[in-house]
Design a protein with these regions (language model features):
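Active-site and adjacent substrate-binding regions of carbohydrate-active enzymes
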Residues: 1-352
């Protein structure tokens, strides 16, 4: 019987660049994390979520990965990473990593090979289009602004959900999926206890690539491009071939997954152990600068979610993450920020399910 150990675990997120610098170069590193393991253990931490530490040009804070098997040398060596895993295990602390497989860096070997030879095998790992009028293939918008399409010197266009330096991976390609699964196994065999899976609801595309209707002045087309029909085929396969073989924790960053889709993602037979529900995020961005109103909106959304999904599956409750401002600044006026107001917000994480 599967032991859902993560249900009883306290997870601590570490952004390695700013966490602890062990050698005085101004950048956090693996040895710095090792130095703080006893402190983290005393805090009651069971799991460390370490944000991207892979080889990367750092265009998007490490979410643009140029080599899934190598760590970024600014943090140390692969041996240092293995030492961190070992030292954490001695203290009964598990480590989960970011898994970024919707896209990679344009400096990744796969994309670089395609740039040299458009007929190579790796060309099928990405989405390329040509147009007759020199205009973008459609009106889809990047999450970072502008078109999802960038043009190559030879006139072709390649697809990117986020920055132009992050070409999207083509999950329709079986050979690519196997490469991804091999990498997942490699890290799990190293002793990693699971993954926080980045932008996973974007991996299935509308292969018609037809333009979508838009609202005047809106950044994105009206019809969503996340959790697209057919995505379950890929997610079930990844779960069966990778996650089910290990008693690991998986938490999906799941924009576009509403309460109606929650069970598919985090239910008893869901694709993942749990999800981050982004229905609660960015309350301060709704044309209302009143923090009191922001709290009311946030509370309503959270309570609705918990009431709907209680007993269906597991959802990671959070107040902020690395993509958002600090919750104290989000929900409180400056003069009201104190130990007591911070404690009141923090108590929500523990009491929401009681």
């Amino acid at each position: 019987m599967k032991n859902n150990w993560w249900k009883e675990s306290v997870v601590y997120q570490i952004y390695p660049q700013s966490f602890m610098d062990s050698n005085g170069d101004g950048i956090g590193d693996f040895n710095g994390i090792i130095q703080k393991l006893d402190y983290l253990q005393n805090l009651g931490v069971d799991v460390l979520w370490i944000c991207p530490m892979y080889a990367s040009p750092l265009v998007d804070n490490g979410y643009d990965i140029s080599d899934y098997y190598k760590v970024n040398p600014i943090f140390g060596t692969n041996e240092d990473m293995e030492h961190l895993i070992e030292e954490a295990q001695k203290r009964k602390i598990k480590i989960i990593l970011d898994l970024v497989v919707n896209h990679c860096s344009d400096q990744h070997e796969w994309f670089q090979k395609e740039m040299k030879d458009p007929n190579c095998e790796e060309a099928s790992y990405f989405y390329f289009r040509t147009t007759e009028n020199d205009k973008e293939p459609n009106n889809w918008r990047s999450n970072f602004g502008g078109s999802v399409w960038s043009r190559l010197p030879d006139g072709r266009w390649y697809y990117h959900t986020f920055a132009k330096e992050q070409p999207v991976l083509n999950w329709e390609c079986k050979e690519l999926r196997q490469k991804i699964y091999e990498m997942i196994h490699w890290w799990l065999e190293k002793g990693i206890a699971g993954f926080r899976i980045d932008a996973i609801t974007f991996i299935k595309k509308d292969l018609s690539f037809a333009s979508r209707p838009t609202n005047d002045g809106e950044l994105y087309p009206v019809e969503k491009l996340t959790d697209y029909k057919g995505i379950g085929t890929f997610l079930d396969e990844m779960k069966e071939q990778c996650f089910d073989k290990y008693n690991c924790m998986t938490v999906a960053e799941a924009p576009g997954v509403d309460d109606a889709a929650f069970e598919r993602y985090a239910g008893k037979n869901g694709y993942f152990s749990m999800i981050f529900d982004f229905g609660w995020e960015n309350m301060e961005g709704e044309n209302d600068k009143s923090s009191i109103h922001a709290v009311e909106r946030w509370k309503k959304k959270m309570f609705t979610h918990v009431a709907h999904n209680s007993g269906i599956g597991w959802s990671a409750i959070f107040l902020e993450n690395h993509d958002q401002s600090r919750c104290l600044n989000k929900f409180l006026e400056r003069e009201n920020i104190s130990f007591y107001s911070a404690s009141a917000l923090a108590s929500i994480l523990s009491l929401i399910h009681i």
